[in-house]
């Protein structure tokens, strides 16, 4: 998890130990990632969801639901970056499913601070 569209830069959501262009090998990310969903839930916004591009039906369902809700909505969508991950583009769907299946990136919804 990083800012892939700006050159694989570290973000507060980048996991501990991750490599990015702004965290060189000798200085990998030394702090745990921020739990962005928990931060949003603490503010009791109307809708928070996590989704993965490996499960497009779930992603579309949550996007549609978010569009129908008034107020602040937060979607954290996991999409592997072949350049940042040094992986093959054809493995993107497989990788995005593996992170969910192995509990690295759980998919869920939170409404008004309550997890479902």
What residue ranges belong to the model's regions?
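Thiamine diphosphate
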Residues: 1-73, 89-90, 94
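Glycine/aspartate-rich loop-and-adjacent alpha/beta segment that forms the canonical ThDP
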Residues: 59-116
């Amino acid at each position: 998890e990083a800012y892939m569209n700006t050159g694989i830069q570290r973000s507060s959501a980048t996991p501990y130990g991750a490599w990015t262009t702004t965290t060189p090998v000798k200085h990998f990310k030394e702090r745990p990632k921020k739990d962005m969903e928990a931060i949003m839930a603490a503010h009791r916004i109307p809708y928070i969801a996590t989704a993965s591009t490996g499960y497009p039906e779930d992603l579309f369902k949550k996007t549609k639901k978010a569009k129908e809700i008034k107020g602040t909505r937060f979607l954290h969508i996991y999409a592997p970056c072949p350049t940042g991950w040094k992986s093959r583009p054809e493995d993107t769907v497989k990788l995005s499913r593996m992170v969910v299946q192995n509990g690295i990136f759980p998919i869920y919804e939170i409404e008004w601070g309550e997890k479902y």
